[in-house]
Amino acid sequence: VTIGTEGMESRDPALVKGETVTLQGKQAEIFVRYRDIRVDHSALYRMDQQQQYIKGFFEAVQKHSVKDSGLVVRLFDRVQEYMVTNMAKDQYLKVAMDAVGSGKLSDEDFYTVPGEGVVTPRYDEFYADKEALTPILLELFYREIE
């Protein structure tokens, strides 16, 4: 990933804005969790970091799974104890394998809830635009009955 946020170097000296870094272990956790609470709406910037990480991780899995067909299964085996799902293992592995073969993730694969950020004396607040959100929810979660 390319570090796009000021101040991460306070958590890890390698995470300097503008530098491109291959994240490993604790560094990856720092990258996806970091936010500077002194900066307004830093939670929104953190979501950008998380999307950047997901895209990079997905690309790496795609690249390495070409040479290692068992990679996706091993990744799920490692995270299984942290998962909660009502899907059978063969079902979620099929979804994952289909995703890995589907091409690159882009910004269009992510949704941000439309709305307005407001800074208050105590917290950053976000108010969803319910009218603008409705078409997104319908597109993602509903299918018209024929």
Protein language model regions, located:
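Flexible, polar/acidic helix-loop-strand segments at domain edges
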Residues: 1-71
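Second-shell loop/turn segments in exported
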Residues: 17, 36-45, 61-66, 78-87, ...
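Solvent-exposed, polar/charged alpha-helical surfaces in well-ordered, non-transmembrane soluble domains
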Residues: 30, 52-59, 70-77, 81, ...
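C-terminal solvent-exposed extensions
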Residues: 19-23, 28, 82-146
